[in-house]
């Protein structure tokens, strides 16, 4: 697969799990999986990323998305790297993980309302953190 295809696949995990851990107030992956509404939101975020990837010529199959949840379930109380950066007061890669995929999706004509909301929530959390 091309580098672009690999990046879209990586975003299928990074966007929801890094993002919801910050937007959820500093929660680990197991807490996301334990909350039906957060788990659903994670799936919707993955679907939005997949739609943009498909429009960009990089189809991602359902089984790949399913596998993201299966692997994450084995991680326990894992804290994604962006959450650790957020909690430690370090810079968070907001543009690379949430901003750029949103921008690319828009350019491709893909509606990504859940990602747009998450992007806003993360930026607000960073402002509040100071």
What are these regions (language model features)?
Residues 4-29, 37-50, 77:
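Active-site-proximal catalytic alpha-helix in oxidoreductases
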Residues 31, 39-130:
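NAD(P)-dependent Rossmann-like dehydrogenase/reductase catalytic/cofactor-binding core
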